[in-house]
């Protein structure tokens, strides 16, 4: 089948232009004004924005954590992603300490293959470093994994500085990229012990035990290690101005550093933790925690200046019943928020319509840059001949109110409940097939695993 999208405005990382898009099978054949080649079906998209399918390079589906499992598996999570305009996710394969990378990869394929409705790939988590893990790294590249993750916090997952140095040296050999969760674990643990001794174990203590300067310190330490190795790294879910200053300082030294942030750090502030209603406060517990309003401003300015390259979600969803496990002890609240279903509309509303960022910037941080950074460009992330026909049809005038009752994710709340978005996703096409129409997910669990190459950003 050939489809001709006629009369829309095509968005790219360079700007916008009025153009038609001709699609055949899974691929885009042509993008241009007044395409005359015949099509089996003409789709009138007059007045619509046509954006490349969004890429969420930071999700946690079907993850065992805090003695429970995330509410969204690969089926429900990918359905929610598609509804939000995301046609590709890159999830984290997470072997436990003592397990091989091969075991982690096989486990995540069992979780995702034949169950995922959008296209998908995996980052590989390195939570240990030894000769076996080092020997397996080359096999990961052969399996289509070109990006990795390490933690500077969480004892069950973290690496010390020595291990991080040696792991980064190994990744440098083949041009791999590594994202790092940056928080100072030792001081966080000390602050938690102080709160326990004081009997202050309510939700409001969560952000006070993970302050911004402990994130900034870890960012600084990571970047000095990366400088010693001479390798670019990704600061995942960067939340605040202090951490951002460390990134800027490294760039001034000549380092190549990439930064990611998330909608919760752009739209919410830490007052959410002060709500006396436990349920209303606990739902926002995540790590790093949501920061202050002035940090929001710094992040938006960094996006505008091109200092933050991607906006992902860190989608890690739990039900309110799961969140209830931390009553009386905030450290037992499973940390994470849902986000894949609302990211595009929120960023358009809070960023583009307020002129904090341009439409081209939105396209770069949601689609083009993650495609380049994680080795999927130009197959993904751009609307041009030869690319996958992943298309988001966005009506900039159709307002939408976010409500948990309407969600397709497997959660019973939404962090952005009651937010009115300006504009709405009307259709989502995945490799030339209509996957979502007017909020209804049509796609089945036939997403493709994407073999990814090297970073080209």
Report the location of each language-model feature.
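Histidine-rich, glycine-flanked metal-binding segment
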Residues: 1-53
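C-terminal cap of metal-dependent C-N hydrolases
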Residues: 8, 325-329, 385-451
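Divalent metal-coordination and catalytic microenvironments
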Residues: 8, 21, 26, 47, ...
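Metal-associated gating/positioning segment near the N- to mid-region
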Residues: 45-115, 132
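Short, surface-exposed connector motifs at secondary-structure boundaries
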Residues: 86-90, 116-121, 146-147, 225-233, ...
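Alpha-helix-loop-beta-strand connector modules within alpha/beta enzyme cores
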Residues: 102-118, 166-180
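Histidine/acidic residue-rich metal-binding segments in metalloenzymes
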Residues: 132-311
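His/Asp/Glu-enriched, well-ordered alpha-helical/loop segment
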Residues: 203-230, 284, 304-305, 309-311, ...
